[in-house]
């Protein structure tokens, strides 16, 4: 770093504080010819905002193989975390290059980064995520430069590994996760009440079919295939493939998420339309194939009846003006459905069934805080954990996680939610809703 900045009339400490590392998004042409934003870690003169040095450190943000699976926002977040660390080195130490960092340097940075500038602690999940981003970066930087640079830390010091025995496959599974460095994360964890109790989904889908039929298929894809909200709106009609076996019997449904939707390429709108977090081919879980297939047929017929195009490159989900639905519109409509239709119906049916006391805590929690459209993907995970009896590796595949660690972290962090899902249930009875229909606004 000091090799880049040479101004002898000032002390080195003063000089270093006049510069800052920032992420600069640059447009590159991808293999498919599309223009995409890619992070670039650049050293700037702070006052003038003039780029001084293009570091090329963005090469170490993630593995090349993983790079194809990460969207621009994730890469941007990784670059931000690395810039935060580089600025700490630049302003708070006299280290001249990354390989001079010691484990104490890294630990001191993580310790100092627990609090924001206003002294408020970072959210625990945010801090852990950025710690992992930094760890990945430092491990990769060491891996690809250890033969040419005299490092004062090693990649192994930043990682812990344990070997577990999978009782079903009878194979050993290696779990690798960031070292704690004897640092506790901030105590500010605030978990959203994202649990959708077993049976609630049936009621929500019922209400959606009546009042929001245009997003019902999207809800089902989140709950029955684990799609994220941004992935739902990225689906074209050609991306949903029906798999058939003998006599035309449907044996599977596969959603092609290997590329961004054609109708979002070259997007010029003011807001982000939604993105695919992990590019993949995602199958609907076997227990729900026929339910999703029926909803897809109904959705397609409804679109065609209103003269919306249903060609292979056309959007499955459109807004009320007939344009491709953005993730913002989709999530807003899910939220409106949740509060205007689902929650009143849940309240009324529980009273009629005499089960309100059992569900009052969930209803109160929903009224206090919206669980978010991501609740459908959580429901999918809960189902796989409690009803399907799959191993964590199998659940990881169905969820579309990029690593085993992500799945294991999810199980550990949501242990209470998993227990509640196992122990609580709601029986959806359509006839009760019909009988009290006038009471549900």
Model-found features: residue ranges?
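Basic, Lys/Arg- and aromatic-enriched nucleic-acid-binding interface segment
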Residues: 198-229
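N-terminal core-binding DNA-recognition domain of tyrosine recombinases/integrases
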Residues: 57-168
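Catalytic-site neighborhood detector that most strongly recognizes the C-terminal catalytic loop/helix
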Residues: 399-424
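Major-groove DNA-contacting interfaces characterized by cationic-aromatic clusters
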Residues: 278-337, 343-355
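C-terminal secondary-structure termini that scaffold catalytic or DNA-interacting sites
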Residues: 425-441
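Conserved tyrosine-mediated DNA breakage-rejoining catalytic core shared by Y-recombinases
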Residues: 235-295, 305-312
């Amino acid at each position: 770093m000091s090799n880049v900045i040479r101004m002898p009339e000032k002390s080195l400490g003063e000089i270093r504080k006049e510069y800052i590392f920032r992420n600069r998004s640059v447009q590159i042409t991808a293999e498919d010819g599309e223009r995409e934003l890619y992070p670039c870690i650049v050293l700037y003169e702070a006052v003038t905002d003039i780029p001084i040095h293009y570091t090329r450190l963005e090469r170490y943000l993630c593995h090349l193989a993983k790079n194809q699976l990460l969207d621009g926002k994730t890469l941007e977040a990784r670059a931000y975390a690395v810039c935060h660390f580089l600025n700490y080195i630049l302003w708070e130490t006299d280290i001249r290059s990354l390989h001079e960092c010691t484990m104490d340097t890294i630990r001191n940075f993580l310790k100092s980064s627990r609090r924001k500038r206003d002294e408020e602690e970072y959210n625990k999940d945010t801090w852990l995520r950025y710690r992992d981003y930094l760890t990945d970066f430092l491990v990769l930087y060491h891996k690809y430069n250890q033969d040419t640079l005299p490092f004062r830390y090693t990649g192994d010091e930043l990682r812990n590994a344990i070997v577990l025995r999978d009782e079903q496959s009878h194979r050993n599974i290696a779990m690798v996760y960031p070292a704690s460095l004897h640092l506790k994360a901030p105590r500010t964890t605030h978990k959203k009440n994202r649990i959708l109790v077993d049976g609630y989904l049936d009621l929500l889908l019922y209400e959606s079919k009546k009042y929001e039929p245009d997003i019902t298929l999207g809800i089902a894809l989140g709950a029955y295939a684990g799609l994220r909200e941004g992935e739902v709106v990225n689906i074209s009609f050609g991306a949903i493939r029906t798999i058939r076996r003998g006599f035309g019997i449907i044996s599977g449904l596969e959603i092609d998420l290997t590329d961004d939707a054609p109708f979002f390429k070259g997007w010029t709108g003011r807001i982000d339309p939604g993105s695919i977090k992990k590019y993949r081919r995602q199958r609907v879980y076997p227990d729900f194939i026929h339910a999703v297939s029926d909803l897809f047929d109904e959705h397609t017929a409804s679109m065609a009846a209103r003269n919306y195009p249903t060609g292979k490159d056309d959007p499955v989900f459109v807004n009320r003006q007939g344009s491709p639905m953005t993730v913002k519109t989709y999530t807003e409509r899910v939220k409106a459905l949740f509060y205007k239709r689902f929650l009143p119906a849940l309240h009324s049916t529980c009273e009629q069934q005499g089960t309100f006391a059992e569900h009052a805590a969930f209803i109160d929690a929903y009224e206090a805080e919206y669980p978010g459209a991501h609740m459908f993907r959580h429901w999918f995970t809960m189902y796989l954990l409690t009803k399907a009896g799959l191993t964590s590796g199998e659940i990881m595949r169905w969820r579309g996680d990029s690593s085993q660690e992500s799945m294991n972290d999810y199980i550990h962090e949501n242990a209470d939610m998993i227990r509640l899902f196992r122990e609580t249930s709601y029986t959806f009875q359509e006839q009760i809703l019909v009988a009290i229909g006038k009471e549900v606004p």
